[in-house]
Swiss-Prot record:
GO terms for biological process: proton motive force-driven plasma membrane ATP synthesis. The lineage of its organism: Bacteria, Pseudomonadati, Pseudomonadota, Gammaproteobacteria, Pseudomonadales. The gene is atpB. This is ATP synthase subunit a. It is a multi-pass membrane protein. PROSITE patterns: ATPASE_A. The keyword Cell inner membrane applies. SUPFAM superfamilies: F1F0 ATP synthase subunit A. The chain crosses the membrane at residues 43-63, 103-123, 160-180, 193-213, 232-252, 259-279. Pfam families: ATP-synt_A (PF00119). One of its GO terms (molecular function) is proton-transporting ATP synthase activity, rotational mechanism.
Amino acid sequence: MAETTASGYIQHHLQNLTFGQLPNGGWGFAHTAAEAKEMGFWAFHVDTLGWSVALGLIFVLLFRMAAKKATSGQPGALQNFVEVLVEFVDGSVKDSFHGRSPVIAPLALTIFVWVFLMNAVDLVPVDWVPQLAILISGDHHIPFRAVSTTDPNATLGMAFSVFALIIFYSIKVKGLGGFIGELTLHPFGSKNIFVQALLIPVNFLLEFVTLIAKPISLALRLFGNMYAGELVFILIAVMFGSGLLWLSGLGVVLQWAWAVFHILIITLQAFIFMMLTIVYLSMAHEENH
């Protein structure tokens, strides 16, 4: 495979199916990264939205099916799996969340399963989903990205949703005055009112950076790990297309080895996203941090 062809292959697999306003004023899909960039802020990543919604529906339907078939007698395989998963998440919440809220455990379960399913799509061979999109659309230049968590828009969207909950519960539990005081009166304090007033800008700067770093680090950690994993799969696929027998053979070994290792990564990243969400919301429920 020539270098330019390999470069084009990689760029094509890392480009989202973007829908937005074209330079001619009409609306349609971008075929190149340059066209997608020209669409601006109001462009939609159709593949990211489609996969995330579809996998969310699969999660809801599977758990609804398990709930409807739940029995106190001999449970089926699906019921056993769901019960183990629910107990695992519930135990994680009890260990890490020190407030009282009926929302946190269901939220943690939703985050873990949903993020895991989106990550797990990365185990599908990199060419299958894009080729299926080409067959359906009939357009050989159309890009299609299957792993939603390799799109920073998806991870940032989830992270800032968690951030909104952090702000909501901080104000609900501590009151607006308590929340503002948390941002302005900590970590430095003084009994002297004048000195305390001088420390308010310093405290606010430190606390604001700490606060805004939570969703950004939450999003970029998931995105970075999944993007790197997807890129490795794509580079291995380039080996298969090299035309060299020894590279193709090496690609088979690497594909299998990386897929096995990647199972740990996709599970761990879903777990970390869930646990950090629980910890951040626990901090929001504390009177003093």
